[in-house]
Amino acid sequence: MQSQPTRFSITSQMDPRPTNGSIISQDTPVSERWPGPNAYERMQYPRPQDAMSIRSVVDNAAHELMSQSDMTTSATWIPNSTPASSMPESELPPYDLLYTLVDLFFKHVNPWSPILDRKATFDTFFGNQSIEDTDRILLHAIVATTLRFSKDSRLTPELKAQFHEISRQKIMLYAFDHPNVRALQALVILAVDVLGTSNGQQGWNLLALIARNIVQLGLDVEKNSYLESAAYPSATLLQASQPKTWIESEERRRLCWMTFVLDRYATVATADAFTLDERAMDRCLPCRYDLFSRNEPVETRWRRPIAQYETFAQTEMVLNRPENLGSFSYHCEVLGILSRIHRFLHQPLDITQRSDILKWRETYRELDGELNTWLQNLPGEYGKISQLCHSDPGSRISNWIMLHAAFVTSVIRLHSSAAYPTIKSHVFTPSYHAIQRCLGAVESLREIAQDVLNTGMLALLGHPFAFSLWVSARLLLVHAATMECTIDPKISFFISTLEQMGQHWQVARDYARILTDVVQEGSSGSGRTFHAMRR
């Protein structure tokens, strides 16, 4: 009887909850839901003498995130008047604290999750008009997500927990009964909070609800008074009303793309499919933040899928106005490449068939080329952000740092499959070139993270940055396990940085704890070795 050929998926099925035993058991990083060539050479090797400072990047970035706040305290930001409609103390913190929390939201969260315009939001919450129920729900979401950043002595841990739970329940109850754009904005902001606390069922369910409502309301396609897509007519009856202004139109576009971003970080290292499939989306990329804030209609970049739901569906360029793109635009683009990498790594592969291996390598090189092209097309100085030095940064640069962390994650995700295959054959052997790419990407992120620490920017970065740190640290464990060598001492830096991020994002603390346990067990001599863990 002829034996069946050996088939395996580059990324194997696993329990989504990381354990000490599973953390280095495959070729690509894993989290609870878990987590050419010349283009990124500059991200792999020691920085040149003309390395840029964060200050120089900030000074050259006047067009990006012009209105984002980097205030450390809000005492001088408290307005003289009180809102026309007072807010019950049992539901929300006092008015001055609310103002502080909204200010903190635009400092710590909105720069990398830019779905709201600062001025329009403050006018809505703290203007002379009374606040409507839909806007109050959005305020609840901001409170729930931003309480972690408040140092006000009045907000004891018990009160924070109380306000958080009240706001969470208010949002969920309202969203179930009122499927509208404002409720979706509140859900997306709440998802930032939930996914920053743990990678578990609650976050996945929340993303599923958001993605379904995005499609139901027709927010996954261009359909407004400025741009319109006729490619994918909706069959639903829950169509959102026409946006009244460019800001409203762009807010909806950003709402869809931010759901896409959160879904990628929550899904990318699982065996699951994405909740929001970009192959069915027909959306322009979001524009620069300053254009958004100025209510200035512009065109950006619009790639339309030629065929839906194919594994690597080709796209056609409908619009291309790169001068109107910002950091969030490029973040969405690189996560689109990561989406294709994710699908590629989950395709079954017969490692005994040379023809299958050749086809696999061809796709692998194509995806590598996409990453190269993306990096080369970044605006001038931002392509060298891995060379940041110490200076006086503001929140305007934090989103560009997170953008490059996403690039590092994509590089590791792709190349670790060739560098550290879980199953080998005479035609599918580990690639030394891929190993160097992975280690170079890890070093690049370490340099960026060191600059972030030296300039006091860590609190400005969101939990996706913690995810990238976790991916890089786990790569060092996989390398030690595969090569049967000692663990790189750099892993201590990644663990320490994750512990510091854990002050605001619980998921970072969990990553640090798991890594610490694995390093201790593998280094103790009495437990399993790293190589034994991977087997």
Language-model regions: role of each:
Residues 330-333, 337-351, 476-479:
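Solvent-exposed, amphipathic alpha-helical segments
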Residues 438, 449, 469-473:
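Eukaryotic multi-pass alpha-helical transmembrane domains
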Residues 394-404:
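Alpha-helical scaffold segments that form or flank carboxylate-/histidine-based iron centers
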Residues 1-110, 209, 238, 310, ...:
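Intrinsic, low-complexity transcriptional activation domains
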Residues 191, 264, 403, 410-412, ...:
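Conserved small-residue packing positions in alpha-helical repeats and bundles
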Residues 84-87, 92, 99-325, 343-358, ...:
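Acidic, Ser/Thr-rich, low-complexity intrinsically disordered regions in fungal proteins
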Residues 436-442:
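Amphipathic alpha-helical packing segments from all-alpha helical-bundle domains
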